[in-house]
């Protein structure tokens, strides 16, 4: 990605789904709170949130958000990324498979490709933690969804037309 660009990633540690991957030139605590509110509107509140100590995650906006929502927030110890190993592994995979491989011509293109990669990760890619099922399918089956429902996306995709550069396994472009 271009210098000065960042990606906010929100993961469900239980289902292994990537709930959001928001790219922008900067991300404030208020933006993080808005993203979390949107996720909670779709999925319900988590028991707690675990994050690193980034400035956007330790901001007054996030402190106010946790007070307003009552959701516990746990910060990993500084310099101890292994305390959030799944997230670190996911971010490394996103970086290796997409961010370091593409030359994005615009923020819009970056957003589309990241969303397409996220959909592939959630809906197509097998995960050993779920016996080879993709995270979305595993979540739907665990929730008792009918098998036919597990084949479709859990939420409408945000990206409309992925670039021909990134071709994930199994998702039509």
Model-derived regions: residue spans:
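RNase H-like DDE/DDD metal-dependent nuclease/strand-transfer catalytic core used by mobile genetic elements
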Residues: 1-120
